[in-house]
């Protein structure tokens, strides 16, 4: 009995020694790999913080036929199960007083109160008849003016700007190069600050980037220490402000997710579409 137990213990001990040797080897290999990695200060890639500035929908989308039927059903259930409002209770009391009037059981002093409830309903009816719904299709929609924020009111709009890279004009999300000592979100906030001449305010959604894009510089600009750039995107919702139409005509657009393909390069567009939603 003692011999099998001893062999088992020796086997366990031998396995543990082999595990320790493998573990030590893997740690030393990992240390060598980290030591061989270039430092961040000497990286040939430049870091950029980009701003994905969105204007949320200003109106709700039109209901589909199914949604209209569902809304009607829920409204009917609400009417059947809800309690009387204060005005409805007052109207019931008014009906009782009118019934008493017919039986000559009412007091003339109560007539003012009886008429007041009806007057309120008449005033509300007139207000309702005078109310006009705003147009969903704006003048900017009719002219296809994509520099205006007053378009596609039921869709998310994204800001694109036109920048010059070499001898080409390229549409991109607004971006700024990272500076030592600041966070990438700080870089994106500084990007927004470059548009501050238009008094634009926005709410950033988190501290982590929502996406990234890597590109190499043109061959004429590329060197061993300057291969390209890595762009990190940060989402923000527009609160107030807009571009000055006079100073930026033709240099920016507000577009929907479906319209991005008219401006962005295919590879850049693929990365941007990954973190954009249009609910």
Curated annotation (Swiss-Prot):
The modification N6-acetyllysine is found at residue 230. It comes from the Eukaryota. This is Large ribosomal subunit protein mL46. Belongs to the mitochondrion-specific ribosomal protein mL46 family. The keyword Mitochondrion applies. It is found in: Mitochondrion. Keywords: Acetylation, Mitochondrion, Ribonucleoprotein, Ribosomal protein, Transit peptide. PANTHER family: 39S RIBOSOMAL PROTEIN L46, MITOCHONDRIAL PRECURSOR-RELATED, LARGE RIBOSOMAL SUBUNIT PROTEIN ML46. InterPro entries: NUDIX_hydrolase-like_dom_sf, NUDIX_hydrolase_dom, Ribosomal_mL46, Ribosomal_mL46_N, Ribosomal_mL46_NUDIX. Component of the mitochondrial ribosome large subunit (39S) which comprises a 16S rRNA and about 50 distinct proteins. One of its GO terms (cellular component) is mitochondrial large ribosomal subunit. Its main location: mitochondrion. GO terms for molecular function: structural constituent of ribosome. Coiled coil: none annotated.
